[in-house]
Swiss-Prot record:
Its EC number is 3.4.21.88. It comes from Aliivibrio fischeri (strain MJ11) (Vibrio fischeri). It is an enzyme of class 3 (hydrolase). Belongs to the peptidase S24 family. This is LexA repressor. Homodimer. The lineage of its organism: Bacteria, Pseudomonadati, Pseudomonadota, Gammaproteobacteria, Vibrionales. GO terms for biological process: DNA repair; DNA replication; negative regulation of DNA-templated transcription; proteolysis; SOS response.
């Protein structure tokens, strides 16, 4: 895929910003006005160029018919990959760019629900269900999880993979290894957030 021109990148960034701010892509007229094009037709030509480069899809017959195919248009070599998360800095979003070690060339749709990122497993606390040290855990980013599911949880500033159990204001994060005790979280005094649901494991490195 050819890289975007500076102008195409501006158009793409505007589309992303509008979707983030309003939930809807901009019209051609809005693109023209925001970026100083002489007409909506000029905006349309840039959209067609972005579609040819496969970073957006144009939906015919709709004034706001633009769908983003890539979240980061400048990461062309990552377009078919799932981000691999390494060390997570305290207080930072798990998908922050500085946490992404690389991308795996694997179809996220092979997992149900689909994988939004991969997390490198450290330690053997989940080995009894086949999640081993060094494995890549496929994770669907969601906070909608049920007791008994294996989740990626952030306790204060630590990220861990455990089986979830909730009892009132207490949360228990269970290991799948009898050598490890459950992590007990008192929600009245500690911070806990669910980063995602474990949906699969990759052990082979041949897909990188």
């Amino acid at each position: 895929m050819k890289p975007l021109t500076a102008r195409q990148q501006e158009v793409f960034d505007l589309i992303k910003a509008k979707i983030d701010d309003t939930g809807m892509p901009p019209t051609r007229a809005e693109i023209a006005r925001e970026l100083g094009f002489r007409s909506a037709n000029a905006a349309e030509e840039h959209l067609k160029a972005l579609a040819r480069k496969q970073v957006i899809e144009i939906i015919p017959g709709a004034s706001r018919g633009i769908r983003i195919l890539l979240q980061d248009a400048d990461d062309h070599d990552e377009e078919l990959g799932v981000p691999l998360i390494g060390q997570v800095a305290a207080g930072e979003p798990i998908l922050a760019q500085e946490h992404v070690e690389s991308h795996y060339k694997v179809d996220p749709g092979m997992f149900k629900p689909q994988a939004d990122f991969l997390l490198r497993v450290n330690g053997e606390s989940m080995k009894d269900i086949g999640i081993m040290d060094g494995d890549l855990l496929a994770v669907h980013k969601t906070q909608d999880v049920r007791d008994g599911q294996v989740v990626v949880a952030r306790v204060d500033d630590d990220v861990t993979v455990k089986r979830l159990e909730r009892k009132g204001s207490m949360v228990f994060l269970h290991a799948e290894n009898e050598e490890f005790s459950p992590i007990e979280v008192d929600l009245t005094s500690q911070s806990l957030s669910i980063e995602g649901l474990a949906v699969g494991v990759i052990r082979s490195t041949t897909w990188m």
